[in-house]
């Protein structure tokens, strides 16, 4: 089971903030990461001049260092992409439940689409450290959007990249590259991709959802998702849900 979640508020200093593609950036920050306990959790970033914090998935972390990979989709993330080294940021860390590594089995499969790829990196790192044979499928629209392939390969993962237009790797969607056998799967990406993975897989697995959030810690109910046991808050009971509890909205 994922470890108990302990949210913390801390100041972090930007060590690196560089583009990986045209609109995807990698930000490395230094600060207190002790509130992060599970792969698949997220942070909430306070930006000057913006009322709502920005939720960003954790790509990787260790003692004193945090890596985020984010996409520029609006004014807030645009402002983030322009922040220089040395900038201090107010973060809520250790948000969300994270993935359950105990269910992985010997040969887990990780499936990421677009900016759903980053939270799978720390998961892969931990699974490899446990001696698992990890396979990864990374899905993008086109070659120019591909990132993180080499990072997963350096961990020792078997990696397949798919592009919708066929300009790089396997042509098609992540579901076109599913292997015949694997022990368990973990997936994160846009909701249409998650639904396609749900319908294409027979094994058990976990889904990490991306939703717009208000508070980020369960107070506002703005990111609720329907499940077999009622509505769950993506920011609190999620963002990771097990396959068998998901009810897709028609």
Annotate each predicted stretch with a short phrase.
Residues 51-58, 96-103, 235:
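Short, Lys/Arg- and Gly-enriched loop/turn segments at beta-strand edges
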């Amino acid at each position: 089971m994922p470890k108990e979640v302990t949210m913390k508020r801390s100041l972090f200093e930007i060590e690196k903030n560089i583009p990986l593609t045209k609109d995807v950036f990698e930000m490395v920050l230094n600060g207190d990461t002790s509130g992060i306990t599970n792969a698949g959790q997220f942070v909430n970033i306070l930006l000057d001049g913006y009322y709502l914090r920005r939720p960003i998935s954790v790509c990787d972390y260790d003692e004193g260092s945090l890596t985020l990979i984010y996409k520029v989709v609006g004014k807030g993330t645009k402002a983030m992409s322009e922040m220089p080294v040395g900038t201090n940021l107010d973060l809520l860390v250790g948000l969300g439940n994270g993935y359950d590594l105990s269910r992985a089995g010997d040969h887990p499969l990780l499936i990421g689409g677009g900016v759903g790829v980053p939270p799978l990196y720390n998961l892969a790192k931990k699974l490899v450290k446990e001696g698992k044979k990890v396979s990864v499928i990374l899905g993008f629209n086109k070659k120019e959007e591909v990132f993180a392939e080499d990072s997963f390969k350096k961990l020792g993962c078997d990696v397949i990249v798919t592009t919708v237009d066929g300009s790089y790797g396997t042509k098609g969607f992540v579901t076109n590259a599913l292997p015949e056998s694997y022990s368990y799967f973990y997936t994160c990406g846009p909701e249409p991709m998650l639904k396609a993975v749900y319908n294409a897989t027979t094994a058990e697995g976990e889904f990490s959802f991306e939703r717009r959030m208000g508070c980020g810690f369960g107070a506002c109910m703005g990111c609720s998702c329907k499940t077999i046991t009622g509505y769950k808050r993506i920011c609190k009971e999620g963002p990771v849900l097990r396959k068998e509890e998901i009810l897709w909205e028609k």
